[in-house]
């Protein structure tokens, strides 16, 4: 779509306004951050301990390398029917939405029995 003259003019004026107000905005941001950092850090220190991100990353790396016996065991306990995705208690998985559940129910409801023989023509 073509850009109108009006929209070009508005865009140009907004850019000029940003240039004009940039120093004020920067000073205001610095002021807010200076005040906010003192107050927030004091509050956070009272509530919780501050831990550097490097330690947290190292900790998660160790957890990933460690064998996961409990979680894999739980996955094995749940036996799902591959055809209709139900588990042993008849529950659908959490990620399956209602529409898909309804569709699966209708597909499983149709039983494939012996097909009836077509009537033969009498000659």
Swiss-Prot record:
What does the UniProt record say this protein does? Regulates dendritic and spine growth and synaptic transmission.
Q: Which domain of life is it from?
A: Eukaryota
Q: Is Cytoplasm one of the keywords UniProt gives this record?
A: no
Q: What is this protein called?
A: Protein LLP homolog
Can you provide one Gene Ontology molecular function annotated for this UniProt record?
A: basal RNA polymerase II transcription machinery binding
Please name the gene that encodes this protein: llph
- Annotated spans, Disordered: 1-23, 55-123
Q: Which cysteines are joined by disulfide bonds?
A: none
Q: Which InterPro entries match?
A: LLPH-like
For bias type Basic and acidic residues, the affected ranges are 70-89
Gene Ontology BP, a term = positive regulation of dendritic spine development
User: Which species does the entry assign this protein to?
Assistant: Xenopus tropicalis (Western clawed frog)
| Keywords attached to this entry | Chromosome, Nucleus
What family does this chain come from, according to its entry?
Belongs to the learning-associated protein family.
One GO cellular component this record assigns the protein to is:
chromosome
Q: Which Pfam families match?
A: LLPH
């Amino acid at each position: 779509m073509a850009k109108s003259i009006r929209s070009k003019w508005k865009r140009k004026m907004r850019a000029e306004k940003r240039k004009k107000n940039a120093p004020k905005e920067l000073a205001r941001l610095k002021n807010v951050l200076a005040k906010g950092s003192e107050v927030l850090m004091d509050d956070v220190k009272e509530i919780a301990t501050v831990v550097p991100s490097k330690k947290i990353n190292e900790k998660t790396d160790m957890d990933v390398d460690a064998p996961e016996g409990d979680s894999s065991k739980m996955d094995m306990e749940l036996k799902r029917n591959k055809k209709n995705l139900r588990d042993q208690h008849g529950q659908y998985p959490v990620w399956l939405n209602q529409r898909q559940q309804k569709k699966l129910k209708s597909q499983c409801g149709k039983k494939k029995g012996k097909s009836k023989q077509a009537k033969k023509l009498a000659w």
